[in-house]
Regions:
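Acidic, metal-coordinating catalytic segment for phosphate/diphosphate chemistry
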Residues: 10-54
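Nudix hydrolase/Nudix homology domain
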Residues: 6, 72-77, 83, 87, ...
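Short, charged, solvent-exposed linker or helix-capping segments at domain edges/interfaces
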Residues: 28-33, 140-145, 164
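Conserved Nudix-box catalytic region and its N-terminal flanking loop in Nudix hydrolases
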Residues: 49-97
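Active-site segment of metal-dependent pyrophosphate-handling enzymes
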Residues: 58-60, 69-71, 77-79, 100, ...
Length: 187
């Protein structure tokens, strides 16, 4: 596959739509549509920016999961605390801010921050980082945006396994929840 052209087709408040023109294996042109959170001016810009973080937080042997209303699918699903990096914000600062804003919890310690990975590679060049952290404090929604509807709670491995079987999850949260339920990580 050879990328021939990158063209912006829409500039939204948060998302920018692009058409990528490729030459496929048969020598024919293929138009591929993507969205990006960042301004892309040339092909080398694709997939270079880290845009956010997903946080797997634990406390006293339990995993933090958020039951959150997601506008794109018009329903609630289980997910991780997560958010976008603000301008000039470090990943560590983003973790602390998002954890507090979405749950009222404080960051006790960072266990591991993984290198950036693509979060929605079929439709976007967005890269995020997964962080495993230990949280402390009391869950509260008083710092949450009016545009977010989140119910945060900590769950035991057994409760997490039951939720995986009966509830709808984001894919990243589902994988982390399963690993947690099988003892693959803890604080």
């Amino acid at each position: 596959m050879k990328l021939l052209n990158l063209k912006k087709v829409r500039d939204g408040k948060y998302l920018k739509d692009y058409e990528l023109t490729y030459e496929n294996k048969a020598g024919k042109e293929k138009i591929y549509e993507i969205v990006s959170l960042k301004e892309l001016s040339e092909p080398k810009d694709l997939g270079t920016a880290v845009t956010g973080v997903s946080i797997a937080a634990v406390h006293e042997g339990k995993l933090l999961l958020l039951k959150e209303f997601r506008m794109a699918i018009n329903c609630e699903i289980y997910g991780l605390c997560a958010g976008h990096l603000e301008e000039n914000e470090s990943v560590e600062e983003c973790i602390q801010r998002e954890l507090y804003e979405e749950t009222g919890l404080n960051l006790k310690r960072i266990i591991k921050i993984f290198p950036p990975s693509f979060s929605t590679v079929t439709i976007s060049d967005a890269k995020t980082q997964i962080a495993f952290v230990e949280a402390e404090g009391t869950i509260s929604d008083e710092h949450m945006s009016a545009n977010e509807q989140i119910k945060a709670a900590f769950y035991t491995p057994q409760e997490v396994l039951q939720l995986i079987e009966t509830e709808t999850f984001s894919s990243r949260a589902q994988m982390i929840a399963y690993g947690f339920s099988k003892g693959l990580f803890h604080a």
